[in-house]
Amino acid sequence: MITTEIKRVKNHINGEWVESTGTEVEAVPNPATGKIIAYVPLSPKEDVEKAVEAAKAAYETWSKVPVPNRSRQLYKYLQLLQENKEELAKIITLENGKTLTDATGEVQRGIEAVELATSTPNLMMGQALPNIASGIDGSIWRYPIGVVAGITPFNFPMMIPLWMFPLAIACGNTFVLKTSERTPLLAERLVELFYEAGFPKGVLNLVQGGKDVVNSILENKDIQAVSFVGSEPVARYVYETGTKHGKRVQALAGAKNHAIVMPDCNLEKTVQGVIGSAFASSGERCMACSVVAVVDEIADEFIDVLVAETKKLKVGDGFHEDNYVGPLIRESHKERVLGYINSGVADGATLLVDGRKIKEEVGEGYFVGATIFDGVNQEMKIWQDEIFAPVLSIVRVKDLEEGIKLTNQSKFANGAVIYTSNGKHAQTFRDNIDAGMIGVNVNVPAPMAFFAFAGNKASFFGDLGTNGTDGVQFYTRKKVVTERWF
């Protein structure tokens, strides 16, 4: 239930809501207004240790619950999430700022991840080969690995936690969750519904906070694996620190996703696709299109239509249904984004749509409108860096080959898209582009939960991605059994 009172956020440890043992807190504003809606604790190491102890104790019994029973329990959780979809979407819009339409879509994608977790009995099946030698059989068995942890970002406060803890718990593990201190309210509601579904205490524990919580998770000897989603520098740190302490780590990092626009594309659908990918969720997503490589032959026509359609987008509070671009998460991020726009102008790019001057229209929130640059090149920071905002750079290329070369020069390799009606172009793109997730006339090539989600290069640190069979492999340990009976 959403109220107007300012809330003091708590941790959830061993089945109970508890105050942090620390005294430091951080204010949580509504990004659309700047008004404080909550205070979140910046929990110390001691709170993490209590959560891990609770998870360890719960693991002794939870890991022995039959796999189908664990899945049935998760199905109850799935039903509660479905019953509370509207409330969950409103909480996301309140504390994250994205439009209610975008928030509703996120809720659905989170629910799909839990649907995957309910199918764990199929995904956890091992392998067997009888008679590998005279009278000897071989088999592979999958077992849970123990206490695992997830560290999640502000931009998808429902979907990304639900990539992690339902699947890990379905595999028989117990979980310590640290969500972004910028979006603590949705995390609270996810945990409330989890225990309404009847799970034993200590199976899922929530510790709110910042860097101290992250470091405590990475250094705790009883945590066996860590899942992370966030920026590239922090992902690299999480991976290096976690593996140094003997943990499995999957760290999904930053992005600079490119789209190549071919002359044979469907122009109207391509323009709408680029707009949706670049500017929905205020561009604060790792699968947003941030660079368009448009072939010269169609460039002028494409840009004219793109600019005209972009100028129609309304910016403002995500609760107002006419608004397409909501606020950025914080004032500090807004200032960072404005710095990138200013650098693009200073570096000589042509600013076709300027999202800086909108305060008179939208008030005191952390707003930056949809922004488009033309004439961008690889020497500019707006091409090189992840901006994480509704800022789109256009690079003109002579053909598909040059577009692929440009895309592959980025240090990031999360997603990439081609807009074309030519199957040969699509095949060439698919086979030569360096990206973990590829779209052909698909605006945001984020796969469904039964496929793995992960990028390449500086967009991912680790071996196994989230979701799908990758997720099950990450949260389980194999035992290879060779047996003979006399």
Swiss-Prot record:
Gene that specifies this protein: iolA1
GO molecular function, one term: methylmalonate-semialdehyde dehydrogenase (acylating, NAD) activity
EC number: 1.2.1.27
Assembly with partners or alone: Homotetramer.
Residues annotated as catalytic: C286
Family the UniProt entry places it in: Belongs to the aldehyde dehydrogenase family. IolA subfamily.
Pathway linked to the protein: Polyol metabolism; myo-inositol degradation into acetyl-CoA; acetyl-CoA from myo-inositol: step 7/7
Record keywords: NAD, Oxidoreductase
Origin organism lineage: Bacteria, Bacillati, Bacillota, Bacilli, Bacillales
Source organism, top-level taxon: Bacteria
Cited InterPro entries: Ald_DH/histidinol_DH, Ald_DH_C, Ald_DH_CS_CYS, Ald_DH_N, Aldehyde_DH_dom, MeMal-semiAld_DH, MSDH_GmP_bac
Record flagged with keyword Metal-binding: no
A Pfam family hit: Aldedh
Catalysis: reaction(s): 3-oxopropanoate + NAD(+) + CoA + H2O = hydrogencarbonate + acetyl-CoA + NADH + H(+); 2-methyl-3-oxopropanoate + NAD(+) + CoA + H2O = propanoyl-CoA + hydrogencarbonate + NADH + H(+)
Gene3D superfamilies, per database record: Aldehyde Dehydrogenase, Chain A, domain 1, Aldehyde Dehydrogenase, Chain A, domain 2
GO BP annotations listed: inositol catabolic process; thymine catabolic process; valine catabolic process
Binding site for NAD(+): F154, K178, E181, R182, S231, E386
Keyword Membrane: no
Functional summary from the UniProt entry: Catalyzes the oxidation of malonate semialdehyde (MSA) and methylmalonate semialdehyde (MMSA) into acetyl-CoA and propanoyl-CoA, respectively. Is involved in a myo-inositol catabolic pathway. Bicarbonate, and not CO2, is the end-product of the enzymatic reaction.
Protein name (Swiss-Prot/TrEMBL): Malonate-semialdehyde dehydrogenase 1
